[in-house]
């Protein structure tokens, strides 16, 4: 399902700053300068600023991670039918990749259910709405994440929660059937065993 997110508010002309979006940011490491220089003309200025000022780490109470795109770009291109026009920006606590697409849209590639959504147009709008309750309800599974953390503990930077067995292979979407796994390896596993996200 493709859905563009928009809601009127009397403050809609005001943009939330990157600092507000990442106010609970936990830094893991600096983004390598060579990565910034390699991609700075291909991605939104807001993302470059995040790379420069915050680096690699987690935000939204650990649900989202700022990633090194070099770690995910080839996998995204191989496993996603829009991979040629998509750029990996973040990953979620359940192994979804949040993308910048066609130099215009923020999308989410959901390997667990082999689906995608175009979340919103413009990076500044994503920044404005990412902590909005309705936006999170539409695109993230915060309640399940909180239950998973309560049962299995907080995730390390390189981890996500993986369903065992995979949802695409008949697994159950609950905390009793998940474990902590390495994010990149788990996305590769979902792609290899269940297939990627393709336009079929």
Model-derived regions: residue spans:
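Serine/threonine-rich low-complexity intrinsically disordered regions
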Residues: 27, 32, 112-115, 141, ...
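Short, surface-exposed, charged/polar-biased interaction segments
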Residues: 68-72, 110, 127, 144-147
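Compact, glycine/acidic-enriched structural inserts
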Residues: 109-141
């Amino acid at each position: 399902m493709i859905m563009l997110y928009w809601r009127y508010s009397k403050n809609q002309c005001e943009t939330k700053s990157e600092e507000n979006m990442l106010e609970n940011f936990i830094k893991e490491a600096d983004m390598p300068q060579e990565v910034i220089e390699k991609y700075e003309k291909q991605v939104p200025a807001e993302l470059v600023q995040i790379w420069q000022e915050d680096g690699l780490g987690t935000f939204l109470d650990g649900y989202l991670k700022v990633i090194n795109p070099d770690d995910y770009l080839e996998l995204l291109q191989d496993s996603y039918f829009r991979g040629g026009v998509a750029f990996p920006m973040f990953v979620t606590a359940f192994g979804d990749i949040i993308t910048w697409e066609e130099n215009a849209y923020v999308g989410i590639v959901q390997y667990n259910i082999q689906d995608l959504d175009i979340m919103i147009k413009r990076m500044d709008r994503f920044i404005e709405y990412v902590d909005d309750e309705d936006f999170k309800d539409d695109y993230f599974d915060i309640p399940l994440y909180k239950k998973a953390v309560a049962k299995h503990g907080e995730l390390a930077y390189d981890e996500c929660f993986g369903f065992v067995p995979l949802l695409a292979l008949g697994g159950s979407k609950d905390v009793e059937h998940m474990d902590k796994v390495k994010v990149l390896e788990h996305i590769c596993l979902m792609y290899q065993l269940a297939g990627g996200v393709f336009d079929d």
